[in-house]
Amino acid sequence: MDAKLLEILVCPICKGPLVYKKEAGELVCKGDRLAFPVRDDIPVMLESDARELAADEDA
């Protein structure tokens, strides 16, 4: 994923920062505990496609 894109992307819900989890292929919002998928190097920033992080899962 492009580093410049990562710098400008924010969570579409809370506008907070995102952390790229390359091994999982996800952008994670720690504030909302949501993980947005990255498909073919394209982030899918739709709330309906995000998954909630489990209580024991590290954000």
From Swiss-Prot:
- Report any Pfam family annotated for this entry: Trm112p
Q: Which superkingdom?
A: Bacteria
Q: Name one GO cellular component term.
A: cytosol
Family per similarity comment: Belongs to the UPF0434 family.
Name this protein carries in UniProt: UPF0434 protein LHK_01103
State the taxonomy lineage: Bacteria, Pseudomonadati, Pseudomonadota, Betaproteobacteria, Neisseriales
